[in-house]
């Protein structure tokens, strides 16, 4: 069981690296697409790949797993819509840090949902996270921009998703079945929103197409399968801590790709 936990944590580390690159991919996709359209293509591609590869298992999915996938997919859709909307108004470096503040929120969200009081060190971590958020976001007028505000909101929503996944997913559940209905639910919701907005078909350029492919194949199909599998064999707080490393990879990759300036407040 210990070896399985180590493997699960290594998988989550790979997920963090993939998600780190996802900040750049998201920015690329937004060059010609709006946030909901990006999510529609992303989740549709992820669900399609999952359905093709694991159809023999998916067609045997019990109703209980479908319900869990729908719940997680709805939370995921809301969170990522908020995240991409925020990315339109802030830098990838800013968002890569702010979106991973969920590592400090998870113990408190668990407290609310599971009635488990966090350890004292969780309160210290929460205070440090707030200080970091303040250094990154606050300007001289002590106000926070809309992009940074939405990024912080996403970190709270994703913290809820981590706790809910830990609550609903046990070691006996088929993660491929769960992931398909999670992605399928998010794809359907985003498609319906695009229908209302009149943005079902959008024009792509090379940059946005590469961004969508990265998000659909790696960030969605590969990473969410990895997350759902690994969280069966490790603790919620450990999972949150490892996945928060996406901020490090996201920041470093954004500095390399966009030549963003490293300032003292990030360090």
Identify the residue ranges that each predicted region occupies.
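C-terminal transmembrane-helix exit sites in multi-pass transporters
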Residues: 49-58, 83, 102-124, 248-266
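Helix-helix packing/entry segments at the starts of transmembrane helices
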Residues: 40-41, 81, 95-101, 165-187, ...
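Specific transmembrane alpha-helical segments of multi-pass solute transporters/efflux pumps
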Residues: 18, 22-23, 51-99, 135, ...
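Juxtamembrane helix-entry segments on the extracytoplasmic side of multipass membrane proteins
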Residues: 4-8, 32-36, 40, 61-66, ...
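Transmembrane alpha-helical segments that form core, pore/gating elements
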Residues: 24, 47-50, 106-108, 112, ...
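Hydrophobic/aromatic residues within transmembrane alpha-helices
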Residues: 29, 38, 42, 86, ...
